Amino acid sequence: MSVAISIKNAVKRYGDSTIIPDLSLDIREGEFFTLLGPSGCGKTTLLRMIAGFNSIEGGDFYFNDKRINDLDQAKRNIGMVFQNYAIFPHYTVRQNVEFGLKNRGVPAPERRAKSEEFLRLMQIENLADRK
């Protein structure tokens, strides 16, 4: 199996606190991988670093041998389900639903059709234009 995600010497700090001091790991293609640890140990921080939502203070992050440290988050092609409330309050419900598709360059008519499908599936089509 080839390595799909490789992290070498990752470091993350918040002020004077080092959350991730020096982490290296390889996750192979098709491998089932779990991050386990107590609250505040850096699990979500690491996932946010991989997705591009948090800065990387040290180390190198690779997807299939391609370094992604400086790759824009929209081009990383990673989905993330947030633990807490994570919508854009200035967007409508539909715009929030379409956000990921728009970042991936999906044409507007296709985004609209997909958002309609998802809104129907969730039975919230009546809320589509609400902010």
What are these regions (language model features)?
Residues 91-99:
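Short coil-to-helix segment of the ABC ATPase nucleotide-binding domain corresponding to the Q-loop/switch region
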Residues 36-38:
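The feature captures the beta-strand-to-loop junction immediately N-terminal to the Walker
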Residues 65-67, 102, 107-128:
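Conserved ABC ATPase "signature" region
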Residues 57-67:
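ABC nucleotide-binding domain "signature motif"
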Residues 51:
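Helix-to-loop junction immediately C-terminal to a conserved catalytic motif
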